[in-house]
A protein has these predicted regions:
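Beta->alpha turn/N-cap motifs
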Residues: 28, 44-52, 84
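Long, aromatic- and glycine/proline-rich binding clefts that accommodate carbohydrate-like moieties
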Residues: 116-169, 173
Length: 198
């Protein structure tokens, strides 16, 4: 929806006026690193969730995550859920074993125990509801659960990650210039359509 896209860009532009210039070259991990390692900044309005930064002894400062701001009176929605997944190569000589492993590592028993204890960020909701895990990571999953539940899953087609990277660069340029929102939305729509042909 072009109208909502323009509103979102305008809102980002308004927020960006309050940012330090370093924000335009930092990725979400760098933001979490600065928040957890210095006392220079205390808040980031939107950031990817990294539960390790909420654990004791991971960094100097323990971060507290919360749900994203509700701008629509529909709850904390509009974020996207992504992350690193697991896949099985079609060239594998042990597909059955790989499939068995995939089910095991994604399963609740593994996710709430060895996966989490080894520094992984669980994607299984049973682990998200686990009180011990929440106690150990400053209630990361409890505090962000509404956002997680209302997020949309990042598209999985081959060209999407390239689109995400390139569109992020273009939006970043827009935030620091006088590019028209109307022109930018048209460009992003074209890029997204082209991402299906990668």
């Amino acid at each position: 929806n072009k109208e909502f896209g323009i509103k979102a860009l305008e809102m980002m532009k308004n927020i960006s006026a309050y940012l330090i210039t370093d924000c335009f070259i930092m990725d979400p991990i760098k933001t979490a690193e600065i928040l957890s390692s210095t006392d220079d900044f205390y808040y980031s309005p939107y950031i990817y969730g990294f539960s390790n930064y909420c654990r004791e002894n991971y960094k100097e400062n323990i971060l507290t995550y919360g749900n994203v701001i509700d701008l629509s009176n529909k709850g904390p929605n509009g974020t996207h859920l992504g992350g690193t997944g697991i896949a099985i190569s079609n060239k594998s000589h042990h597909k059955d074993l790989a499939l068995e492993y995939s089910y095991w590592i994604a399963g609740a028993d593994c996710q709430k125990s060895i996966f989490y204890k080894s520094g992984g960020q669980p994607g299984n909701s049973v682990a998200w509801d686990n009180q011990q895990i929440n106690n150990e990571c400053n209630n990361f999953f409890t505090n962000t659960r509404l956002t997680l539940n209302q997020a949309w899953i990042r598209p999985r087609h081959n060209g999407y990650m390239k689109f995400q990277d390139e569109s992020g660069n273009i939006i970043n340029e827009y935030l620091q210039s006088d590019i028209s929102e109307d022109i930018l939305i048209d460009k992003l729509k074209t890029m997204y359509a082209e991402s299906f042909y990668e």
